[in-house]
UniProtKB/Swiss-Prot annotation:
This is Phenylalanine--tRNA ligase alpha subunit. Mg(2+) binds at E251. Gene3D superfamilies: Bira Bifunctional Protein, Domain 2. It is found in: Cytoplasm. Keywords: Aminoacyl-tRNA synthetase, ATP-binding, Cytoplasm, Ligase, Magnesium, Metal-binding, Nucleotide-binding, Protein biosynthesis. The gene is pheS.
């Protein structure tokens, strides 16, 4: 077959190729080990010395022509494939965007943030402390005697006789009073642990305690601040009562109730004036300084604010429940 005919045949097959695989078959047919041009090169040995150089040059020129045609068609096919892919993946910018559903704060986190915001505006700073506490900071310094029920094994998680998971964040107040001098205004949010589990109790829950120590601090100050806090937190006018109670670390002590929508009183927090023995335990003179303290269960406040009946729902990570608080 003459070279012109081979070139024409190759060009025809190259033009007809619709994909890279077919184009490669054309390359093999004409320039592979057993290709038509390769066979012609092998036949050069049969020619005379005078004919061989000119014939070899013509075969190589034909090979270059076919190779250039294959390269050009290959580039065309790659461009065509890319354009096709881009067209398939094209985004219609005139369509409205697909919005992602945003996450949201856990209801307990929301409550803690609301509490911190309110008391922060009154000059209270946020303090934290260890969740593994010793007996002095968890009990002794708080005027809780050795025979108090709170110190029993069935209420407290002990590591050894003097180390335990804290049962309240009051230890943070003790550590703050040891480290800083009055005047003091602090709140201490955090996790606390008690050996209890039912519809209204879990072994771990969140608590916020507050402390104010200064000269001439009175129960009237405590009552006014808590009254304003509850109205601010629930965002409605509430009937509030302070009911006499007993806590080892405060004297006098009170529990604060709000009137529920069902016409019944609901306990929301405990409070009182810091007991002189607590001030003495941290080296503060109770003759010079007085103070008040209060404590509230975060989950309980959250339940009341959002109408949740089972405290355990806060810890089950059910998205159907949590999405209600967006």
């Amino acid at each position: 077959m003459e070279l012109d005919a081979i070139i024409n045949q190759a060009q025809s097959q190259i033009d007809a190729a619709q994909d890279a695989a077919t184009l490669d078959q054309v390359r093999v047919e004409f320039m592979g080990k057993k290709g038509k041009l390769t066979d012609l090169l092998k036949g050069l040995g049969k020619l005379s010395n005078e004919e061989r150089p000119a014939a070899g040059q013509k075969i190589n020129q034909a090979k270059q022509v076919i190779q250039q045609a294959i390269s050009a068609k290959g580039e065309f096919l790659r461009t065509e494939e890319l354009n096709k892919k881009l067209a398939e993946e094209a985004v219609d910018v005139t369509l409205p965007g697909r919005t992602e559903k945003p996450g949201n704060l856990h209801p307990v986190s929301r409550t803690i943030a609301r509490i911190e915001s309110f008391f922060g505006e009154l000059g209270f700073s946020v303090k934290t402390g260890p969740e593994i506490e010793d007996g002095f900071h968890n009990f002794d310094a708080l005027n809780i005697p050795a025979n108090h029920p709170a110190r029993a094994d069935h209420d407290t998680f002990y590591f050894n006789p003097d180390m335990m998971l804290r049962t309240q964040t009051s230890g943070v107040q003790i550590r703050t009073m040891e480290a800083e001098k009055p005047p003091l205004r602090i709140i201490s949010p955090g996790r606390v642990y008690r050996n209890d589990y039912d519809q209204t109790h879990t072994p771990m829950f969140h608590q916020v305690e507050g402390l104010m120590v200064d000269k001439n601090v009175s129960f009237t100050d405590l009552k006014g601040i808590l009254h304003d806090f509850l109205h601010h937190f629930f965002e409605e006018s509430l009937e509030i009562r302070f009911r006499p109670s007993y806590f080892p670390f405060t004297e006098p002590s009170a529990e604060v109730d709000v009137m529920g929508k069902n016409g019944q009183w609901l306990e929301v927090l405990g409070c009182g004036m810091v007991h002189p023995n607590v001030l003495k335990a941290v080296g503060i003179d109770p003759e010079e300084y007085t103070g008040f303290a209060f404590g509230m269960g975060v989950e309980r406040l959250t339940m009341l604010r959002y109408g949740v009946n089972d405290l355990r729902a806060f810890f089950e990570n059910d998205l159907r429940f949590l999405k209600q608080f967006n």
